Structures are given as C-alpha cells and as structure tokens.
Amino acid sequence: MKKLLAMMLTVILALTALMGCGGSNDSTTKATEKDQSSASQGTQGTEEATQSNPGEYTLPLTEEKQELTVWLAYSGSVVTDLNEIEGVKKMEELTNVHINWIPIEQQQISDKMGILLTSGSYPDIIDTNVLPGGIDKNIEDGVIRPDHDKLIKTYMPNYMKYLEENETARKQATADDGTLKIVRILVGEDYNVKAEGVYQGVAYRKDLLESLGLEEPKTIEGWHDALVKAKESGIENPFMINTTGGSFLSLAWGVTTMSQTYLQMGENGKVLGAALQDGFGQYLETMRKWYAEGLIDPNFTSFNFYLDTPNSVENNKQLLYTHILSAFTGNNYATYHMVNNQDEFLQPIVAPAADGGETYMDYSPLEGKDQMFITTSCKNPELAAKWLDFFFTKEGELLNWYGIEGTTYTMDADGIPQFTDMVLNDPNHTPPATILEKYALGWGNCWIGKHNTVASEKVATAAAGGMNQQAAAVEIWTSGVKNIGLPSGYTLTEEESDKVSTKQTAVQTLIEEYMVNYIIGNDDTSFEDFKTKLVQFGYQEIIDTYQAAIDRFNNR
C-alpha cells in the first residue's frame, strides 16, 4: 500500500505540471497599510531602480544590480539552489536583478504560510496558492501592499496587455471594487491566455466492453444494458459511484452531484441549487434502480478513488467508473506500473444526455489563478512589479518553461518553440521534465508568472511515447455542449461567508446523507419532501448569496 501511495503521489504531482493548482476565493474587507521592516537584501531607493518613463518596459530593469527576496512553492528535486537553474541565470542577466529565493515544498505551504504571516517580517514578493484570511484581510493586516492597482497599471504593461485581451482573465484578476489587489498567475498556451480543461470525469474499461462484444453506449439506457451484460458475464458489481452517492454521470440529467456547494449555473446567469432540480431526483431514481439490480458496488461508500481504483482495474472488478483523473486514463495505470494488467484501457466519455438532447459539463474555466503579491516589507515595490512583469514577456515565458534556446528548445519556421532531442529523447531515458528542471524554473511544479499548458502537454506527450492520453481525456471531458459550472474568481464578502458557512455544512451533510440512503434503499423520503427540508435548512439563502457574488463578478 505504501508503494502504491508513493506512486500515486508521484503521478498526481506529474499531473499538476499540466493542470496546476487553483486558488481559493477571497473575502472583502477594509484595506489599511501598516509599516513593516524590510526583508530584502541589497536593495536601494525607489528612484534609482526605476526608469524615467515607467510606462515603457526595457531591459535591464535597473542599471545597477539589485536584489529581491521571493518566497514561492517549489517541489523540484534536481536542484537545491534555484539560482543554478540555467533559465534563472539568464533572467538575472537580462533583468540585472538577483533573487534570493525562499523555495517551499508544496506540501508545506499551508504550515509555512501561517508562520510567515504571523512573523511581521516578509520577503519582497510572495507567490502562493494558499492565503489564510484572503487578500483583503492580508491587506488590512499589513502583509500585502494596498497600492497594487497603481503598481500593476504603471509598471506591468505586459501583464496588463494579457488582461486587456482576455475578458475572463481580467475579471478573475480584478476585485469587486474594480481594482487589481494582487497579481494573478495566468494560464495559457504560448503567448496567450486560455483556460485549462476538465481533468476528471466518467470513464469505462474499453477492453472489457469489447470483450463483451459491445460498442460504447450512447444513452443512459444503453449503459444500463451494458452493465447488466457485464454482471451476467461475471463482473459482480460493474459500476462504481462516489462515496457520497454522487457521480459525474449525473450530468446526463443536467445536474452536478460532485460538488461541495451543490450549486450550478442555469440560463441567463442564474445560480441554481442542483439538489432542487428535477434532474437530481431523476438521477437518484436511476441509481436506486441500478443499485437494487446489483449494478452498483455496495462498498461505494468506502471506495477511495485514488487508492482503490488500481486494485479494481487489476482484477477487472468494474466496467464503469464515475470518477477518474485524466492522468490515469488510457492504459496509464499499466504504463505507470501501478497494475500488471496490460490490457486495461480506461476510455473517458461525456455523460450522454438522458433526454437525448445536448450534453452537459461542469466546467469552471480558470485563466487567472493563485496570487503573487508585493509585501509591505518591500523597499523597492516598483522594481518588484517590473520583475514580476518580466514573466509575462515572451523572453520570460520562454525562459520559465522552455529553458535555453539552442540547448533545450529551438524556434520552428512559424516562430513556435519546440523542445530539442536532448529533452525529448534522452539516451538514458531520463524523463523530459527532470531534464528541464535544470534549465527552466517552471518544471519544479512552480507556478510564477504565466503557466504554459502547451509546454506541459509537449512534455507529457513525449513522456507517454508520443501519445498523450491525458490530454485526450481533458479534451473529451471539456466537450459538453452546455456548461453548468460556476465561474471561477467570484468572491464572497466576509459577511456573506460568515452568514452561510454553517448553513452550507448542514445542507451538504443533508444532501449527501440523503443521496446515499436513498440509493441503497434505506430512505424512502420523497424528493419533494427532501427539497422542502433543504429550503428549511437555508439552501435558498445560500443560493441567493452566491447569486449576489456572481453578479458582482459579472459586473467587474
């Protein structure tokens, strides 16, 4: 089990090289500024480090060598000193800014961030996907400088250009009051901003379905018949649902059952309670019927999709899975030596529409995630802003993700960077990502500046022998015609969070207990009575609160 867990963690970390980590919502409170002592070393006055025309972006950023201290998540294992990375050396040469790095293992971010915030002395720049209290609380507490809006608009023209070109990214980077309070890590391909896709969903064992002489079903009824045939062939419990009774298959009825909020978007920007929709009841009725027929594994409430799926795949225990990560689709369980079953092939699917109409997906596009910010300890905030902006330049993006031109990448005839054979075809079979850790900062599972998904996909494809099943899965799961996912980047105020947090916990518990007990036949409460109880527990108030937050987001 320990070996399996270690392998699972390794693969999931590899997955983050493609998908990254999302940030959390931030509460809105009054901002004040507090003086803090400097944590930077070797910095000089503001005027000496900035150009006479701040609207222009030129290199080097400063005539005289300057230093900044940067705290960030970094989980690479090849280098111990980030200044030994070849791309980082080149960045220093171009910017004339030396960085005193404070790298933190991703698993330690929460603990280390808590300690840092209470210390009262901060590095010049912090890059993190964990921020206790949210942005406004840390402005009020004197951690984050309150003048980011001016700094960004004056000294970060390359970042601003991306925001001006992408409306969603601009909204996700902007607070409800219309200001830019921090710098967002932007997601995209080479030189553009574009959201990532859906990285988890329904998948079936293609090899087992073919052994039954069946083609992929295109309807819910077809899947029912396939599960029946699988059971008759010896697969005792062919469908595995989530521990809560939910499933991405519920999208067939146009509802989400795999959400902590159990909220979704309807027509014209309206927030809906998923558990109040007719489709929710139809999903539960179908699952109750399938469970009674022995098609759903009775141990679903204790099944761990991370740890238990390999054993299920190894021993052909299931035909259909409600929840698979893109990293484990195709025959990747075998590729990663997590199973010995070389025939296994997990084929992703979009849940077929139960009414025969258009398909659904639960997708929250994220172009601007996590946060980078300049702290109140920074004595040279203008230089810090310019240095952050370098990562949004063409040179910065190439150095951060492709490394050194002529060594780890070349430019093709269309001006597109392509990794060299040194990276993709190492004679010692060293993984491309491992090679790149010596040359490009981004390959230490480090998100700073812009997260280039194309570079990640190229490496993942090479590592998979030229066939990127993971990317193919993402494309399939993001192909639903209608999207019911809430937008990314909306924020609840501190007052709103306090008002609904307890209600949300109670509603979530009520929904999940009802789903499980109704499916297994232990609860005969009608769906209408269940909905009435949800409203009594404050479900509508939660819906209204999120509606207000999303309305503010849409009006940014």
Report the location of each language-model feature.
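Loop/turn elements at helix/coil->beta-strand transitions in domains of secreted/extracellular proteins
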Residues: 64-68, 95-100, 119-124, 141-145, ...
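Conserved small-residue motifs centered on glycine
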Residues: 395-517, 522
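Glycine-rich, aromatic-lined ligand/substrate-binding cores of catalytic
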Residues: 222, 289-291, 309-332, 338-342, ...
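Positively charged n-region of N-terminal signal peptides that target proteins for export
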Residues: 1-4
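C-terminal motif of bacterial Sec signal peptides marking the signal peptidase cleavage site
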Residues: 16-20
